[in-house]
Regions:
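Core catalytic region of metal-dependent phosphoesterases/phosphodiesterases
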Residues: 60-162
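Active-site environment of divalent metal-dependent phosphoester hydrolases
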Residues: 54-59, 83-87, 111-117, 154-164, ...
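N-terminal active-site segment of His-dependent metallophosphoesterases
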Residues: 12-95
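Acidic, His/Gly-rich catalytic cores of divalent-metal-dependent hydrolytic chemistry
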Residues: 9-29, 255-312
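Beta-strand-turn-beta hairpins that frame and shape the catalytic cleft
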Residues: 35-47, 151-152, 158-170, 192-194, ...
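Active-site neighborhood of phospho(di)ester-bond hydrolases with catalytic His/Asp-centered motifs
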Residues: 48-50, 75-81, 103-110, 154-156, ...
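Binuclear metal-dependent hydrolase catalytic cores centered on His/Asp/Glu-rich metal-binding motifs
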Residues: 118-151, 155-157, 163-210, 273-276
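Conserved beta-sheet core of the metallophosphoesterase superfamily
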Residues: 204-285, 292-293
Length: 312
C-alpha cells in the first residue's frame, strides 16, 4: 500500500510539474482550412488570437507572438482576455508588434476589464454562474493602443471593410460571460454582398451564437474556453467555463445549418491556475476558402477542416 501511495503521489507531482512548467509554455500554431466564403471568393488568411492573459514577465510568450507576423496573415482577429496584470498593456502591444499593422478586429473579455483572482476550481464544474471580479484593468489603454494602429473595435458595432480584395461584413458583442452582450444593437441580416460575414465574441455562449446564425453569418470566432485547459485522454475537455458543450471547447464545428464556429484554445492561463494538460496553448491560422454551392448537412461537424499543429 505504501508503495502504491508513493507511486500515485509521485505521478501526481510529475503531472503537475509537466502541466505547469512544460505544456503551458509549449506554444503551438494550428493551421486550419474552412470553406466559409461565398462561392468564387479567393482564399483569406486569418490569424485568430485569444486569451493571451499576459503578464509583463512572460518573455517566452511575447517572443513567440512576435514571430507570428512571418505567417503574413491578411486579417488578425483577437477575441479578448489579453491582460492578467495592471502593467501588461505594453507587453501585449510589444508582443503583437507588427501584427498591429495588419488589418485587425477585436473584442474584449472579462480579463481585459478585471484582473484575475483565485477561484475555487469546482466552480467551473458546479457553479458556473458565479462571478468573482478582481481589480479593474486598463482596458481603455489597450483599446487605444489597438485602434491607434488601425485595428477595429467590434464591441456592439457592425462594420464593412475590404481585406485582400474581399468584402468583409463583421459584427461583435461585448463579453457574454459578464452578461455585457447586447446583441440587439447589431441585430439584422448580415450583408448579402460580402464575401465573408464574420461574428466576433469572447465567450461562445449558445444564445449569442444562435443570434449570429439566425442573422445569416457565415463564421463566428470566439475564445474564453482555453480549450478546456485541463483535458483527459479519450474524454477531452473537463469543462468549458460557459454553456458551450465540451465537444466544441476548441477548434471548428458547425452551428446550425449554415454557420461555422471556431473556438480558440488560447495562449495563456490565469496566473492562479498556471497549468495546461492535453491542451497546448495555441494560435490558429485559418485559411478561409469558398464554400461549395450547396450548404453543409445540418448537424455535421466541420469535417472538411483538417488541423495541423507545429511549434514556432
Amino acid at each position: 500500500m505504501k508503495n502504491t501511495a508513493a507511486i500515485a503521489a509521485g505521478s501526481l507531482v510529475a503531472g503537475i510539474g509537466y502541466a505547469s512548467l512544460i505544456e503551458r509554455n509549449a506554444f503551438a500554431l494550428r493551421e486550419l482550412t474552412m470553406p466559409v466564403l461565398t462561392p468564387g471568393s479567393t482564399p483569406l488568411r486569418v490569424l485568430h488570437l485569444s486569451d493571451l492573459h499576459m503578464l509583463p514577465r512572460q518573455r517566452r510568450k511575447q517572443e513567440w507572438l512576435r514571430e507570428l507576423v512571418s505567417l503574413q496573415p491578411d486579417l488578425v482577429v483577437n477575441t479578448g482576455d489579453n491582460l492578467s496584470h495592471q502593467k501588461a498593456v505594453p507587453a501585449v502591444v510589444q508582443a503583437l508588434g507588427d501584427l498591429l499593422s495588419v488589418p485587425g478586429v477585436f473584442v474584449f473579455g472579462s480579463n481585459d476589464y478585471f484582473a484575475p483572482k483565485p477561484k475555487n476550481p469546482t466552480n467551473y464544474l458546479f457553479n458556473k454562474k458565479r462571478r468573482i471580479h478582481g481589480d479593474p484593468l486598463p482596458w481603455q489603454d489597450l483599446r487605444a493602443a489597438f485602434t491607434e494602429r488601425g485595428w477595429l473595435d467590434m464591441t456592439h458595432v457592425r462594420r464593412e471593410f475590404e481585406v485582400a480584395g474581399l468584402q468583409i461584413a463583421a459584427a461583435g458583442v461585448d463579453d457574454p460571460h459578464l452578461k455585457r452582450d447586447r446583441y440587439d444593437t447589431i441585430a439584422g441580416p448580415a450583408s448579402a454582398k460580402a464575401n465573408l460575414t464574420l461574428g466576433v465574441t469572447h465567450s461562445p455562449e449558445p444564445w449569442v451564437l444562435d443570434r449570429f446564425a439566425a442573422d445569416g453569418y457565415q463564421l463566428v470566432l470566439a475564445g474564453h474556453t482555453h480549450g478546456g485547459q485541463l483535458c483527459l485522454p479519450f474524454y477531452g475537455a473537463v469543462a468549458t467555463n460557459c454553456d458551450l458543450d465540451r465537444s466544441r471547447a476548441k477548434g471548428a464545428s458547425q452551428w446550425g445549418a449554415d454557420m461555422k464556429l471556431h473556438v480558440s484554445a488560447g495562449l495563456g492561463t490565469s496566473p492562479y491556475a498556471p497549468v495546461r494538460f492535453c491542451c497546448r496553448p495555441e494560435a490558429t491560422l485559418l485559411t478561409l476558402v469558398a464554400a461549395p454551392a450547396k450548404g453543409p448537412v445540418i448537424g455535421s461537424r466541420a469535417g472538411q477542416a483538417h488541423p495541423t499543429a507545429s511549434v514556432r
